[in-house]
Amino acid sequence: MIRGPPGPRIVTYCVTYWYGGEHLDTFNEKLGLRVPGHVAVILDGNGRWAKKRLMPRTYGHYQGSKVVEDMLHVVDDMGVKYFTVYAFSTENWNRSKDEVDTLMKILRTYLVDCVAKSMKNNERCRVIGRPDGLSQDILDSIHNLEEKTKNNTGLNFTIAINYGGRDEIRRAVKSIADEVKLSRMTLLSR
């Protein structure tokens, strides 16, 4: 049974069916495919997926979070070295309070569960994004996850939380403007 948006599960099932459960690296060799060094996924559309099935948007978010585990197994089996999941963007704060609260609840659970799974699978986990706006328990869970997995040597798994392209560009431009401003002040004061 497919729990959420089906992409990686279908790939896994097809490989198992076609090659009797051989690892994906063998599958790639047979097809002559080059494995990418880094795969990044934006978790988008889970709410719409649920709505199409006449379920609440939050159901889609829960199911989408479970699919991340399937994706981790697929990219690891393929031999991908770096996997990034964009889990919560800065733009997600604009959603309803109930939806944001649900996303934070899912995130809390995921971060705690991720420690044991990552240790078992030798995955090194890092979280990128802005800490502001995140609760202290989530920040503590992030620190715990990164600290416990820092010496793992397998797949490098990055979770982007409170991260957004527009926000990153805005902060970069502001930083450059601040540097220019400081340089002008230094030049004018001489």
Predicted regions: what they are:
Residues 4-190:
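Flexible, compositionally biased loop and terminal segments
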